[in-house]
Regions:
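Short acidic, gly/pro-rich beta-turn/loop elements at beta-sheet edges
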Residues: 100-102, 208, 272, 343
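Alpha-helix initiation/capping motif
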Residues: 85, 106, 116, 219, ...
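Mixed-charge, polar/low-complexity N-terminal
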Residues: 25-26, 31, 38-39, 43, ...
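Glycine-rich ThDP/TPP pyrophosphate-binding loop and its adjacent helix/strand module
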Residues: 138-335
Length: 368
């Protein structure tokens, strides 16, 4: 088990003494490929800026519906995705933008989906919570808490039947561990020895309820033990630690054909969604979460600078490149057409039926 210190702002009962005071430890960087390290940093920064632009567009009413951001969870997202092959499958909850990009989706099409435009990854019908792409094997994006778990187990069962060495990763938030589908899915996954890694991104608050107040066992990685599923915990702010832990469990699932559980301590910088003011957190907790010492992007950048991998000039170059790519994604979304109303009911049914949208609004059935 890779146990770590909990961020102070994460829980009403969290103690500052459990936190690691310094986040600039470079002990694990010396043996890493410098180009690979810079790539991790670049990907983390891109998610940060992409989500910031998403938040801005939402407040400008360019994006509608629900919207949940990965701000503060960039190291977790990038670390997890670094453990997967292109042929591995991914299921996530509604906080899925960063995962979609990391799994290989074009950021332009992800942004277009957020805008509800025709060129989006789900043709503008899914929006923020429902990123989906069979080519990259990112199969959602699910708006129902815990809804992705049984489906992920089904994909793992299909993998077993096909006798490939692919693995399914199923990401969720801490609140999902109290949903019935959690217990049912972990039970069947172990009974049938499915090649799946369950990942709980523990940001300590399920909407407005802390883990300490909702879970009798707040050490969530231990909750797999009821089903004899081995679990680990990792500091979700440490991209290398997340990558290593995820890689270890993914490869074990691949080789041993059995499920594993990974809990990643993380912290979202915003409320549950863009419109959530997070009044259930004290100002001290908010300030602590946003402090540089707990910011995963700043932490990793400082580590690379201290290790002479990333210069200040290099930081500026990466920042400029990322800014340009995010702007391109936003421009693409702005200029993408809206879906035609005639396609409203396309793909609603498994078997072809007349497109009912063509009856609107002139059809007498809609008349007063």
């Amino acid at each position: 088990m890779a146990d770590t210190a909990k961020p102070k702002g994460g829980s009403a009962k969290a103690s500052g003494s459990r936190r690691r005071n310094s986040r600039k430890d470079t002990s694990g960087i010396a043996n890493e490929n410098p180009d690979a390290l810079l790539d991790l940093y670049r990907r983390m920064l891109f998610i940060r800026r992409f989500e910031e632009r998403t938040s801005q567009a939402y407040t400008q009413a360019r994006i509608g519906g629900y919207c949940h951001l990965n701000l503060g969870e960039e190291a977790t997202v990038v670390g997890l995705m670094s453990a997967l092959r292109e042929t591995d499958y991914l299921y996530t909850n509604y906080r899925d933008h960063g995962y979609a990009i990391e799994k290989g989706m074009d950021p332009k099409r992800v942004m277009a989906e957020l805008y509800g435009r025709k060129d989006g990854v789900a043709k503008g019908w899914g929006g923020s919570m429902h990123m989906y792409d069979t080519e990259t094997r990112m199969l959602g994006g699910y708006g129902i808490v815990g809804g992705q778990l049984p489906l992920a187990a089904g994909a793992a069962l299909a993998v077993s039947y096909r006798e490939t060495d692919d693995v399914v990763m199923c990401q969720m938030g801490d609140g999902t561990t109290n949903i019935g589908a959690w217990h049912e899915t972990l039970n069947i996954a172990k009974l049938w020895n499915l090649p799946i890694v369950f990942v709980v991104v523990n940001n300590f608050t399920g909407m407005g309820t802390t883990v300490d107040m909702s879970s009798a066992e707040p050490d969530l990685y231990k909750r797999g033990s009821a089903f004899r599923i081995e679990g680990e915990r990792v500091d979700g702010r440490d991209v290398l630690a997340v990558r290593d832990a995820a890689t270890r469990l993914v490869e074990r699932a691949r080789e041993e054909q059995t499920p594993f559980l990974l809990e990643a301590w993380s912290y979202r910088m915003k409320g549950h969604s863009v419109v959530d003011p997070a009044k259930y957190r004290t100002q001290e907790q908010k300030d602590e979460a946003r402090a540089k010492e707990n910011d995963p992007v700043a932490i990793f950048g400082d580590q690379l600078t201290k290790a002479d991998v990333l210069s200040e000039e290099g930081r500026e170059e990466i920042a400029a490149s990322v800014k340009e790519r995010v702007a391109e994604a936003a421009d693409f979304a702005e200029n993408s057409p809206h879906p035609d109303v005639s396609t409203l009911f396309d793909y609603t049914y498994a078997t072809p039926v007349p497109n009912e949208s063509r009856r609107m609004p002139a059809d007498p059935v809609f008349a007063d």
